[in-house]
Amino acid sequence: MGFIYDWSEERLEIQSIADDILSKFVPSHVNIFYCFGGIVLTAFIFQGASGFALTIYYRPTVVEAFSSIQLILYHVNLGWFIRSIHRWSSGCMVLVLILHISRVYLTGGFKKPRELTWISGVILAVVTVSFGVTGYSLPWDQIGYWACKIVTAVPEALDDLLPGAGKLLVLTLRGGFSVGQTTLTRLYSIHTFVLPLVTLVLLIVHFSLLRKQGISGPL
């Protein structure tokens, strides 16, 4: 082990990186309310782990989606537990995210020079809501189907500003004029690939900015 550490240290300077991370100054005014961002990240990790486990058995087809959820809940070992983690951690993530945004706003954490940190955080909030919107329809039950139909019709309101743009966006989301298999496939792809990738990139940006600028001071 010593040889591996020495070899890695010589090339990567691991110790200096660890010292920089562990020796970061934490302002004295920081309290429990500054932990909301970390809780959101923890919930996202739970979401990713439980979501990956669910993809093993979930089938993104209009015929088998609902039955695959029933399989997970009632026949797969600990399937009900994994889905419960995914479901409840999503609610926790949204709730704590609201608290996190409120704390940052009320303490002035969005002010100069932290505007970019705030902007990246707001975009992350939008992505988080998008996770909920796309994931809600994946079971493809009655609630999921009608929620999908309503949500995918919302962009049509853009036609008032840009004629034709809203309808084009609706067709893109649905993959046609009606909600069906193509819609479910696109929602599944967005939920399991596009949004996680975007989130990871934004998290790197968000934490890099936070690391560079530090925690905002008290009011």
Swiss-Prot record:
CDD domains from the UniProt entry: Cytochrome_b_N
Family annotation (SUPFAM superfamilies): Transmembrane di-heme cytochromes
Record bears the keyword Metal-binding: yes
Chief place where the protein resides: plastid
Keywords associated with the record: Chloroplast, Electron transport, Heme, Iron, Membrane, Metal-binding, Photosynthesis, Plastid, Thylakoid, Transmembrane, Transmembrane helix, Transport
Record GO biological process: photosynthesis; respiratory electron transport chain
Cellular-component GO terms for this entry: chloroplast thylakoid membrane
Any one GO MF annotation of this record: oxidoreductase activity
Positions contributing to heme b 2 binding: 86, 191
Subcellular location: Plastid, Chloroplast thylakoid membrane
Record membrane topology: Multi-pass membrane protein
Cofactor note: Binds 2 heme b groups non-covalently with two histidine residues as axial ligands.
UniProt subunit comment: The 4 large subunits of the cytochrome b6-f complex are cytochrome b6, subunit IV (17 kDa polypeptide, PetD), cytochrome f and the Rieske protein, while the 4 small subunits are PetG, PetL, PetM and PetN. The complex functions as a dimer.
PANTHER family cross-referenced by the UniProt entry: CYTOCHROME B
Note: Heme 1 (or BH or b566) is high-potential and absorbs at about 566 nm, and heme 2 (or BL or b562) is low-potential and absorbs at about 562 nm.
Record's protein name: Cytochrome b6
Taxonomic lineage: Eukaryota, Sar, Alveolata, Dinophyceae, Peridiniales
Gene: petB
